[in-house]
């Protein structure tokens, strides 16, 4: 796996700059001064009405107090941990020096700092049970990492989980797994001992003489006041009797049945002794009987420290599967020879087949087809070992393919057309280097002599153009990553013609140059393909993750009054918790207004819903009401509910929202986001202060783009900046996305790169095409249209949109502009109705020509 770092250099997982440079405070919001000023007034006064405007998401999640968590290397109940830090107070409490275990973006276990702990109340929980005996009680919106039946691996809200989903479970925990004689002695005592304080006596019972002997040796070593004797009774049972005040004091301090804190530093010794006393082989598994649920849960955590995945059934812990049994015997083992022999036989048996996950076959197939990979496995479910091996094999081939595509892109990045003006300037040098006479070169320059392909290559080479190398790169791309049919479709010719052109030495260089541009576009499409990046990220996760997927068997809702707790882990927003180790989540949001109003408490006073995802009246009646019923945290006078895309709500849902807004107006403020305020019913609009976000000024966007370019080490040319501003049309998100896309091509941001990644034609090209038509040069205008379509890969609708924008910049009178704008609208309607786009675009140019002739 050491070569995986090389794969990371492909940078397929770079965070979108739109998120990276998202404003965190009101002062960072660009170009909406009128809105910021009003919002700051609300912050200053500490009050605000309902608002109608747009903003980003975020919501907090919590667990019940009996949830177990490893913090600073020790196992705690979440309740115990949070109550100790918070002093019992509700809301968030900052904390330093507290570390928990979680997973990073590749599914690898890491230690994370906790920023603060949190305590709250709720009336609704979701209880989740799994095949391995896990039980989690979490708030309905708490996300859990799951593997769904369609192969997706994603965070899913607890209330949306279904039986059959598989829950992410760590395969091991980085806890101390050492040896310790006291831990071993306690393992024997809890497994087969009994204390009688009145008689000052400790008894240990076990039929195995080796274990009795070991218990006596440890007792003598650990307790200097111990008097030890072994007695075999008439019924044949043998017991060890110990008189020791020191030993009695220790065992009386242990409390309820659980793993004593003294045992964690020597957990290996404890487990071996405890399993020797209470464990054994039953059927195809090692089974351990414990004294309590608490003990069985803690045993599961302890086993996870050795990479042993276990299953809980009430008070029993079960270890099954050849791999898990083998790990147990290698890491812990039995001293009892009979148990050891039986367990060794289990190693030879096959695993039961539960250690696997469902694969996102569609996504992996997409990666395979996009990069023309040869290696593949068409199974829909892979074992953990298969997932590691197959995804790693795929990643090796992917790395090779991406590297080859980058090299092909470099080879195709320079045109192969000869600049004959340059040849004329350097005619003597060219003649000398090529062996072609100067007079022949002049005839080539003037077009009086037909140039052979052989001579063309010679001349191009002198000018620094390696035509043969470029053609070979074109052939490689066509054979390995595309098809003659695809290239032919974009070129507007038959695939057989493309093959002939690429494979023959009698080449039409102008057509070859067009093919080069098409192939370069295709390469860039592959390298910037978001779904491909998603697929590669998925495979990296499969190849590196350290997770087991435990199938969910039951999901149920609990009602009542519950105290809930959370740990805030910045950055990765997850930690390992549960009655058995499970990956759970915490999250944050980036709503500038909430940060300003609530400070550190904003997370707990803010709820986000997306109406387009959760349409209908149930959203209003359940989720909104549940959140609105709870009191604000941290002394705030109200909470905020942010409802994104509110115009997607049905009329009934909006009426319910209106009633809810009235019902909870004393402690809740709503922020509604919509694309069209006209779709929001009037009673809601009348209850909101309406904020209309206008397109940003070019100078505001330019300032932000220059800042980002400087931070990212880019050279943002003035031409490149103006091109971005032209395309963005006042949309900051679009501008930043274009900048990031252009940066993937080159650190120098030019207008050429911008128009290329944005799939837009240059405005001057559009104007030139329209002016040619107006001047009566229909055929040249038609040729220019085809050049634009092929060069930029635009759709007919894209061309019409740009024509509509540029027609008002033409040097013609206003009535003509009005007429042509109307015609553009008419032909756009024809395209929407399904007409042939080339015929309609050429017909529109014909209309321009007819108008021009009338003038």
UniProtKB/Swiss-Prot annotation:
A family per Pfam: AAA
Keyword Amino-acid biosynthesis (UniProt): no
Cross-referenced CDD domains: AAA, Hint, HLD_clamp_RFC, HTH_XRE
PANTHER family listed in its UniProt record: REPLICATION FACTOR C / DNA POLYMERASE III GAMMA-TAU SUBUNIT, REPLICATION FACTOR C SUBUNIT 4
Note, other: The intein interrupts the potential ATP-binding site.
Family: Belongs to the activator 1 small subunits family. RfcS subfamily.
Stated name of the protein: Replication factor C small subunit
UniProt source species: Pyrococcus horikoshii (strain ATCC 700860 / DSM 12428 / JCM 9974 / NBRC 100139 / OT-3)
